[in-house]
Amino acid sequence: MPSFDIVSEINMEEVRNATDNASRELSTRFDFRGIDASFEYKDKTVVMKAEAEFQLQQMESMFRTAMSKRNVDTSSMDVKPYDAHGKTYRQTIAFKEGIEQPTAKKIVKLIKDAKVKVQTAIQGEELRVTGKKRDDLQQAIALVKEANLGQPFQFKNFRD
């Protein structure tokens, strides 16, 4: 019986490369000369530090550009609100990995409401979709791709 898995994974090596590229761009930009600003990658999060709030916004834009150049979907970014420590502003960016329970239930409901002849099962942080026909599975993939659920999904282990 044909099946596939829906997962949400991020290549953290590419995130680290994007962080390095954004740091390099930060050091060469004229509007950041003489300003204490930096990107730090640690424990699957990126911490941005700057002297003003508008600089953090510019840095976030730079980081999003670097991520898209490295082919990492920016919808996986979870940007936390900034906090001020003295004259330094900090902002943390976390990344959504795995499909959380509420999102998984939304995907199951989406597929069931479309009346596609497939069965979906939640298996931890991924979903297994099984059906009799390959066309039904491809229709389920198209439904999930069209839905805007706030994070990127990959489709793996497509088996006939």
Swiss-Prot record:
Keywords recorded for this protein, A-Z: Nucleotide-binding
InterPro entries named in the record: DUF520, UPF0234-like_C, UPF0234_N, YajQ-like_sf
Gene Ontology molecular-function annotations: nucleotide binding
Coiled-coil blocks: none
Gene Ontology terms: cellular component: cytosol
SUPFAM superfamilies (alphabetical): YajQ-like (SSF89963)
First and last residue of the signal peptide: none
Presence of keyword NAD: no
Main function: Nucleotide-binding protein.
Protein name: Nucleotide-binding protein MADE_1020535
Organism: Alteromonas mediterranea (strain DSM 17117 / CIP 110805 / LMG 28347 / Deep ecotype)
